[in-house]
Amino acid sequence: MSSVLQKLITPLASSSAEPPRNKVTVVGVGQVGMACAVSILLRDLCDELALVDVMEDRLKGEMMDLQHGLLFLKTSKVVADKDYAVTANSRLVVVTAGVRQQEGESRLNLVQRNVNVFKCIIPQIIKYSPNCTILVVSNPVDVLTYVTWKLSGLPKHRVIGSGTNLDSARFRYMMAERLGIHASAFNGWVLGEHGDTSVPVWSGANVAGVSLQKLNPEIGTDGDKEQWKATHKAVVDSAYEVIKLKGYTNWAIGFSVADLTESIVKNLSRVHPVSTMVKDMFGIGEEVFLSLPCVLNGSGVGSVVNMTLTDAEVAQLKKSADTLWGIQKDLKDL
């Protein structure tokens, strides 16, 4: 006796369906991971979304919650499992998993614990999606992007850190608020480390091509009477402030990751400040990952824009690199 399905559907194709072309995997279903996942879904950036985590109940719950809303989205398939086989054929893998810093813990110890976590994650990603691009979001992101590159064996252009894409967005928002314009109307970049030693490029800050440094040669310096430098300090402090108020940050980084995802899966060749291998650039001699203006396309980081920086800005960038290398050089088991 024929089933309802057999009566309803007459198959025409003899072969099974093609594998997904724009499959995105998010590793880690915490606050940041789910903000990334939802942002990617809302922008219709994948034809399949896979979620992976070690916490099976939370993972299944998040998967079901998203699946129940698929009617309202254009992505047809959301899957999840602790087994990385579910990630097979991913075009992009977003890594948000990692351990949190404990009170009084050194950054080196935090990174070393995350190295041990990543040693379980990265080889599994490569096993099932050898042609993927990896976007690292876990903090400290620049060092963990280096760790991912070393563990994955992928070429450097296919291992990217979310870097200062969010720092730059915060900078543009805060500067634009002070100027009374929309964030998209202010052009400004924050480079270097995602964190305390990030570098605001005051020499390039402009509105409609009008250089703010030409209007105020002291902008961003201690001698600036208008104290624009305080805006960058607010950028650096902003994550700490949000964490103090709500316990974590997730929405802005989720939007930022979706923005980067779009440039990669749609092959847009847009320029973003993301973490990439900077050895031999700006006089940096070590294998560190820092944020520079990168052209993101289907191959990952297609190229790096050779931004004109002042001597002071280059010195700050080198300081950023030294800070990161100070941690990286003592890492074990890489």
Swiss-Prot record:
Annotated catalysed reactions: (S)-lactate + NAD(+) = pyruvate + NADH + H(+)
Location (main, coarse): cytoplasm
Alphabetical keyword list: Cytoplasm, NAD, Oxidoreductase
Gene Ontology molecular functions: L-lactate dehydrogenase activity
Any one biological process term the GO annotation gives: lactate metabolic process
PROSITE patterns (alphabetical): L_LDH
Effect of residue 114 to S: In strain: Isolate New Jersey 137A
E.C. numbers: 1.1.1.27
Membrane-crossing residue ranges in chain numbering: none
Effect of residue 45 to P: In strain: Isolate Georgia 2B
Location relative to the cell: Cytoplasm
Residues reported in the UniProt entry to bind substrate: 107, 139, 170, 249
Binding-site positions, NAD(+): 30-58, 100, 139
Stored CDD domains: LDH_1
Pathway: Fermentation; pyruvate fermentation to lactate; (S)-lactate from pyruvate: step 1/1
GO CC term, one of those recorded: cytoplasm
Active site residues per record: 194 (proton acceptor)
PANTHER family reported in the protein's UniProt record: L-2-HYDROXYCARBOXYLATE DEHYDROGENASE (NAD(P)(+)) (PTHR43128), L-LACTATE DEHYDROGENASE B CHAIN (PTHR43128:SF2)
HAMAP family in alphabetical order: Lactate_dehydrog
Assembly and interaction partners: Homotetramer.
Assigned protein family: Belongs to the LDH/MDH superfamily. LDH family.
Record function comment: Interconverts simultaneously and stereospecifically pyruvate and lactate with concomitant interconversion of NADH and NAD(+).
Protein name: L-lactate dehydrogenase B chain
